[in-house]
Regions:
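Conserved N-terminal entry element of GNAT/NAT acetyltransferase domains
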Residues: 1-13, 149-157
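Conserved beta-strand-loop-alpha-helix junction that forms the acyl-donor binding cleft
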Residues: 86, 114-125, 141-144
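Acetyl-CoA-dependent GNAT
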Residues: 34-88
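Hydrophobic alpha-helical core bundles mediating ligand binding, dimerization, or RNAP-core interactions
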Residues: 18-23, 41, 45
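Conserved acetyl-CoA pyrophosphate-binding loop and the N-cap/start of the following alpha-helix
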Residues: 87, 91-100
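Helix-loop element at the rim of GNAT/NAT acetyltransferase active sites that forms part
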Residues: 20-34
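Conserved active-site alpha-helix within GNAT-family acetyltransferase domains
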Residues: 94, 106, 119-137
Length: 157
C-alpha cells in the first residue's frame, strides 16, 4: 500500500528527515544544488504553500518512508518530475516511478512528463528507459527525457 504525504503537511521529524536525505552524498550528487542549510530548507517548504506550480511528496509503503517524488513547472499540458529514494534503500525506484506516472496523469491530468537526468546517472536513465521514457534532447550535463500519457495507454499493463 502506497501513500503520499504532501510536503505542506509534514511534521517536524519528517522535515528534519528530508533535510538530512536532501544533503546526503548519495542523493545530492545528482542535484543541481548540492547543499542547502536548514533555514533554506524551511523557506523552501514555506514557499510550497503558495506555489501551485510545484508539488512535493513523501512516499510511504506500508507505513515506512521509502522516498520523495516531486512535480515542478506544472502546467495544464506537462510537468517536470524528480525523485529520490531513502538513502541505502534499494529496489524502490520502480515504485517511485509508478507513483509519479499515476499522480501526474491521474491527478495533475498532464499529457507529458519531463525530467533532466545527469548524464553520469546511468542507473536513473536505465530506470526511466525501462519505463518507456525517451531522450528528446541533451546538453553538456543532462539528458532531457519525456513520456507522453498516450504512450502509456498503448503499453501492456
Amino acid at each position: 500500500m502506497i501513500k503520499l504525504k504532501n510536503f505542506t503537511e509534514l511534521n517536524s521529524q519528517e522535515i528534519e528527515l528530508i533535510f538530512k536525505w536532501r544533503n546526503h552524498p548519495d542523493i545530492n550528487q545528482f542535484m543541481k544544488t548540492k547543499y542547502i542549510d536548514f533555514e533554506e530548507h524551511l523557506r523552501f517548504l514555506k514557499k510550497l504553500h503558495q506555489d501551485s506550480s510545484k508539488k512535493y511528496f513523501l512516499v510511504f509503503q506500508y507505513e515506512q518512508i521509502i522516498g520523495v517524488i516531486d512535480f515542478v513547472n506544472i502546467t495544464t499540458k506537462s510537468c517536470e518530475f524528480g525523485l529520490y529514494a531513502k538513502p541505502n534503500l534499494k529496489g524502490v525506484g520502480q515504485i517511485l516511478i509508478q507513483e509519479i506516472k499515476k499522480y501526474a496523469f491521474e491527478n495533475l491530468k498532464v499529457n507529458t512528463l519531463k525530467a533532466y537526468v545527469f548524464k553520469d546517472n546511468r542507473k536513473a536513465l536505465k530506470l526511466y528507459q525501462q519505463n518507456h521514457f525517451t531522450i528528446y534532447d541533451e546538453d553538456k550535463d543532462f539528458y532531457h527525457i519525456c513520456l507522453k500519457q498516450s504512450d502509456c495507454k498503448a503499453l501492456p499493463s
